[in-house]
Amino acid sequence: MSSPRQVFYISDRTGLTAENIGEALLNQFGNLSFKRHTHPFVDTPEKARAVVEKVNRSRQENGQRPIAFVSVVDDEIRRIIKGADAFQINFFETFLGLLEKELNTEATVSGQGHHSIGNTKRYDARMEAVNFSLNHDDGVSDKNLQEADVILMGVSRSGKTPTCLYLALQYGIRAANYPLIPDDLESADLPRMVKPYKDKLFGLTIQPERLQAIRQERRPNSAYARIDTCRSEVADAQSMFRRHGIPFANTTDKSVEELAVHILQACKLKRRF
């Protein structure tokens, strides 16, 4: 089996832009394996030269040319990184010129605009949504639950918490979640805490076999992780969703990104930034 291809995400800020676009591209090659290295805040020539050394060392040690996804605004730093022995995709260099041509104006280049706290409204909306999701995780509180944009329901370990946090971080959505426990699943009614907010409910389900694997890691060889328990809980949860007309999605083969977009569309939610 061939060794994984080395991939470098290089950015003068957080690296999120390079990672997000790079991952979207690499995911189209599911038959290959990659080893990822992220280098954020490469914002000085010295840092850029240090990264170039690491990339070149990787080329020498692995015998394959690394792939580098670069999100750097500064021309000098980009020139230094270009000296690395790697196949490089530079997002600003690739797309900025095309956009300048289409808009018939030169960009006012600044490294402060992307992923910056300078955009106060965007930052505040994100932090408010994250705090809301954390305060309403796993049904811990119904205080101000009426302010939720969406309330995710599902059995334990069906993906509720990461989906809520992703919705909050990426879209500013106030997402709460409620775990369906055996008492809830045995009832014909909706859980008391979320019943007043039926129109905000969205269900998450999962294949029992996948659920068992996740639970087995958390509580090995417990009744909680038995396959018959998982099958029963998943079936009962889906019956509840159908009985009350609650839309739901299967998380088994969906990334959190795909799931979040699906929820936005199904619930007709609009991002806050």
From Swiss-Prot:
Catalyzed chemical reaction(s): [pyruvate, water dikinase] + ADP = [pyruvate, water dikinase]-phosphate + AMP + H(+); [pyruvate, water dikinase]-phosphate + phosphate + H(+) = [pyruvate, water dikinase] + diphosphate
Keywords: Kinase, Nucleotide-binding, Serine/threonine-protein kinase, Transferase
EC number, as in UniProt: 2.7.11.33, 2.7.4.28
Protein's UniProt keywords contain Ribonucleoprotein: no
InterPro entries to which the protein is assigned, alphabetical: Kinase-pyrophosphorylase (IPR005177), PSRP (IPR026530)
UniProt-recorded Gene Ontology molecular function terms: ADP binding; ATP binding; phosphotransferase activity, phosphate group as acceptor; protein serine/threonine kinase activity
Ligand binding (ADP): 154-161
Keyword Kinase: yes
Sequence similarity: Belongs to the pyruvate, phosphate/water dikinase regulatory protein family. PSRP subfamily.
Function: Bifunctional serine/threonine kinase and phosphorylase involved in the regulation of the phosphoenolpyruvate synthase (PEPS) by catalyzing its phosphorylation/dephosphorylation.
Alphabetized NCBIfam families for the sequence: PRK05339.1
Protein name as annotated: Putative phosphoenolpyruvate synthase regulatory protein
Organism per entry: Neisseria gonorrhoeae (strain ATCC 700825 / FA 1090)
